[in-house]
Amino acid sequence: MEHKLSPLPYAIDALAPQYSQEAFEYHHGKHHNAYVVNLNNLQKDTEFEAMTLEEIIKKSSGGIYNNAAQVWNHTFFWSCMKPAGGGEPTGALANAINGKFGSYAAFKEAFVKSAVGNFGSGWTWLVKKADGTVDIVNTGPAGTPLTTADKALLTVDVWEHAYYIDYRNARPKFVETFFADLVNWEFAQANFA
């Protein structure tokens, strides 16, 4: 099956000034799109051509896996942000976060520290473990919880291309802004349910 670049779940300028239209033009329009194009080219005439994106991620390796995982990760990441985002989670997810970390503030501090400390290019995830608890997990360049027993709830992209246009080399400022103004807790809560 041919994969398509998923549209953003909001207007390209909807997250400005915290995430600019220019950042989306490069991050979504060029980087994310390149993963889609590469995946389509790499899977041609292989067993993966008839599989869903999730099946490809779970069964492939090398370039096909890297591009498939990056397509999925980016599509997921766009939904982790929303216009006028921020705030704190509620309900069962808030209870799980408080149960694991003691408070939302302690969770946020741990997540920011983990994301800032994620060496090189990668992703920092809030995941639901098989036992129903939550945890923070760092993955490398194309890592994704889809290949584990964890369920992705929320992620922040810490590849430099994710934040360099708006934040230059200030990854901590980007991650702090993600929580203050962009995070979509409703999406994470729906994933937790």
Regions inferred by a protein language model and the residue ranges of each:
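Feature for soluble, non-membrane regions of globular proteins
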Residues: M1-A193
